[in-house]
């Protein structure tokens, strides 16, 4: 409970994992959306609650049967506005001024440092197992795209692994 304020949407995911996930069979598709972001049958502008009811995804499309999980399209975090970089990324700039103009260094780690706190992601990575830590650090330093919003649809068997790994990691942080 003391960490709840830091978990945001994950508070519900934790509750679901602890209280509901076990009631589903391993092949059942389970999906999570986010406030004002929903899984839709097709790309369409939602203008009313009626539009949402008509277009919200209620069962997985057949083409998903060849997948284990489905996640949102990635978003790019490179090329932050220069003023934002100066205001929020100044610690990163002091450490490495080339971040200001080198797009390869405008990565996920920089984005996280700017928006969630400098060094927090590095400290969180330190409590990971060695192999995962190395892969994670490489990913956040080498990439400028990630899949946002904690939105995904997956079968129970994969959600169980995801939640176990995720919350074990978060409890160590």
PLM feature segments, named:
Residues 1-173:
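ER/Golgi luminal nucleotide-sugar-dependent glycosyltransferases, focusing on the catalytic module
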């Amino acid at each position: 409970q003391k960490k709840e304020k830091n978990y945001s949407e994950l508070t519900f995911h934790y509750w679901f994992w602890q209280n509901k996930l076990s009631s589903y069979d391993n092949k059942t598709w389970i999906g999570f959306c986010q406030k004002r972001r929903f899984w839709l049958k097709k790309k369409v502008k939602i203008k009313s609650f009626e539009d949402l009811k008509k277009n919200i995804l209620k069962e997985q499309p057949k083409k998903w049967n060849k997948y284990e999980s489905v996640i949102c399209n990635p978003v790019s975090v490179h090329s932050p506005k220069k003023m934002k970089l100066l205001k929020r990324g100044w610690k990163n700039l002091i450490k490495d001024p080339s971040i200001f103009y080198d797009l390869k260094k405008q990565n996920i780690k920089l984005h996280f440092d700017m928006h969630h706190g400098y060094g927090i992601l590095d400290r969180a990575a330190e409590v990971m197992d060695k192999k995962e830590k190395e892969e994670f650090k490489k990913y956040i330093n080498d990439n400028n795209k990630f899949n946002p919003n904690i939105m995904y649809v997956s079968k129970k068997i994969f959600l169980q692994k995801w939640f176990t790994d995720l919350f074990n990691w978060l409890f160590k942080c």
